[in-house]
Amino acid sequence: MAKKVTGMIKLQLQAGKATPAPPVGPALGQHGVNIMGFCKEFNAKTANQAGYIIPVVITVYQDRSFSFILKTPPAAVLIKKEIGLESGSGVPNKTKVGKLTQDQLKKIAETKMPDLNAASLESAMRMIAGTARSMGVTIEE
């Protein structure tokens, strides 16, 4: 018989830098999960993605065990990394902060593809382009 699920926790953590401090500790503590066990496992699995923010979905079972699924980094984080930005524009319709080429856009879309509900690479590229525009990044044709 399958284990009974008692909770789902969604967090966005720095790759390889999960610690028992907030937000990890309180989120897992209220479900009775071994916090250090999660931190060690998460850090081991994300060590090669240093510098990225990794969304993680933690499933907590009745016997206080857990499993987790790593997602791809948010599109905004990938865009900022690709063009070397610190942050997006405060007023994206007026202030432009960078340019993204079609090749860079395609690379980001391919990275995000498993987590997007897009049927094709072209539609994934349009989704990423929309995110870029809302950050004040222009897309070169």
Curated annotation (Swiss-Prot):
Pfam families: Ribosomal_L11, Ribosomal_L11_N. It comes from the Bacteria. CDD domains: Ribosomal_L11. One of its GO terms (cellular component) is cytosolic large ribosomal subunit. GO terms for molecular function: large ribosomal subunit rRNA binding; structural constituent of ribosome. Keywords: Methylation, Ribonucleoprotein, Ribosomal protein, RNA-binding, rRNA-binding. Gene3D superfamilies: Ribosomal protein L11, C-terminal domain (1.10.10.250), Ribosomal protein L11/L12, N-terminal domain (3.30.1550.10). InterPro entries: Ribosomal_uL11, Ribosomal_uL11_bac-typ, Ribosomal_uL11_C, Ribosomal_uL11_C_sf, Ribosomal_uL11_N, Ribosomal_uL11_N_sf. Transmembrane segments: none annotated. GO terms for biological process: translation. One or more lysine residues are methylated. Belongs to the universal ribosomal protein uL11 family. Part of the ribosomal stalk of the 50S ribosomal subunit. Interacts with L10 and the large rRNA to form the base of the stalk. L10 forms an elongated spine to which L12 dimers bind in a sequential fashion forming a multimeric L10(L12)X complex. HAMAP family: Ribosomal_uL11 (MF_00736). PANTHER family: 60S RIBOSOMAL PROTEIN L12 (PTHR11661), LARGE RIBOSOMAL SUBUNIT PROTEIN UL11M (PTHR11661:SF1). Forms part of the ribosomal stalk which helps the ribosome interact with GTP-bound translation factors. This is Large ribosomal subunit protein uL11. The gene is rplK.
